[in-house]
Regions:
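Catalytic loop of short-chain dehydrogenase/reductase
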Residues: 1-12, 18-69
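C-terminal helical subdomain
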Residues: 71, 75-83, 87-129
Length: 129
């Protein structure tokens, strides 16, 4: 189920909208990933399915970027956000929903075409795959 939500869904939506996106001046696809989807820098939690699905979303982002040079594709980690999903027994998430959303929009609006296929934090930092 989680693979359908985090990988298959974004792939199908992207494929459906690509013909329209390719007609726009500066088309971009922004995939909301997670730092937990980094194969090289992710801490290990008991969220294997989630982590694997976000790693797959990152790969999907890279594959689309390689295939569609006229569209900018990036994956963005929204941070550890103060949401129901982000709650922890030990401490509160440090990032507010509004700060995360603003950061994602800032990155999306400022990302250049040559950065297509990249993985970024909501603060604009390059993250390792």
């Amino acid at each position: 189920m989680i693979q359908h939500t985090n990988v298959t869904g974004p792939m199908m939506v992207t494929q459906a909208f690509l013909p329209l996106l390719e007609k726009s001046d500066h088309p971009k696809v922004i995939n909301i990933s997670s730092g937990l989807g980094s194969c090289s820098a992710s801490p290990r939690f008991s969220t294997t399915g989630y982590q694997c699905s976000k790693a797959a979303l990152n790969m999907l982002t890279k594959c689309f970027a390689d295939e569609k040079k006229n569209v900018t594709f990036v994956a963005i980690h929204p941070g550890w956000v103060q949401t129901d999903m982000g709650k922890s027994k030990n401490r509160d998430p440090p990032v507010t929903v509004s700060d995360s959303a603003k950061g994602i929009l800032d990155v999306a609006n400022s990302i250049s075409d040559d950065k297509s296929g990249g993985f970024y934090s909501f603060e604009g930092k390059v993250l390792p795959y």
